[in-house]
């Protein structure tokens, strides 16, 4: 996939919606809906659902439990809708007895977020080596010497799938495979984008992968080298 070879890492989110009937506007405002899934779009979903309620729409409770858990909750019919960073496959769709509509919702960039006193620029090969746990000192990245701690997702995650797809495209030295979860050889695991960002925020010397919207405070975004040799930070414009 050509997009995976750009300097920024891309992810998108699908919403899984059960078939439903029509209701009057008065009934609609009293509806309570529950959803669960990807943490990648959680911030924009929270904003949208707040605006929806303020405009007389239904009250929506969304839990950012990760794509894998959200899909399971939707299949098990414990929520009204789910959110996943990639579409459901036929074998999972067959398990949904109430009907299913998959709607593309949002796209965004995944950043290498880090907490260290350094203007970090990563080549694609360096990015792969960091994620594989091959680099454990900031000096190897042209920064002042210090312990480097890799932070990754511990739950089934569409963000992880998009991230590992890009790592595989970046270099043939990537050997961890791709998917919502992989066997990380080292590092600290955390649930959700917020969990990973929290560990980075509280751990000087930490680096991991997060949705661009979690880049704030002590969590800075690394610039990643593209195929033209330029170092690019993830932004709305770049994505």
Predicted regions and their residues:
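Exported/periplasmic ABC-transporter solute-binding proteins
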Residues: 20-96, 100-239
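Short, low-complexity disordered leader/linker segments with a strong preference
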Residues: 1-32
């Amino acid at each position: 996939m050509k997009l995976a070879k750009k300097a920024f890492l891309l992810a998108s989110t699908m919403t899984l919606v059960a078939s439903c009937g029509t209701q009057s506007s008065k009934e609609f405002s009293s509806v309570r809906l529950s959803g669960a899934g990807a943490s990648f779009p959680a911030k924009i979903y929270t904003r949208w659902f707040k605006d929806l309620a303020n405009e007389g729409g239904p009250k929506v409770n969304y839990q950012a439990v990760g794509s894998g858990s959200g899909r399971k909750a939707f299949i098990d019919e414990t929520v009204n809708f789910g959110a996943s960073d990639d579409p459901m496959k036929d074998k999972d769709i067959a398990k949904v007895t109430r009907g299913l509509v998959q709607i593309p919702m949002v796209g965004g960039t995944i950043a290498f977020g880090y907490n260290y006193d350094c203007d970090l620029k990563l080549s694609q090969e360096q990015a792969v080596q960091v994620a594989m746990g091959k680099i454990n000192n900031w000096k190897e990245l042209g920064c002042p010497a210090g312990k480097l701690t890799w932070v990754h997702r511990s739950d089934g995650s569409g963000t992880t799938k998009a991230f590992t797809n890009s790592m595989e495209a970046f270099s043939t030295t990537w050997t961890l495979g791709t998917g919502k979860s992989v066997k990380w050889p080292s590092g600290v695991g955390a649930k959700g984008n917020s969990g990973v960002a929290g560990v980075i925020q509280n751990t000087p010397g930490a680096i991991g992968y997060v949705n661009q919207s979690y880049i704030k405070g002590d969590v800075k975004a690394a610039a990643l080298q593209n195929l033209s040799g330029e170092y690019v930070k993830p932004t709305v414009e770049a994505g």
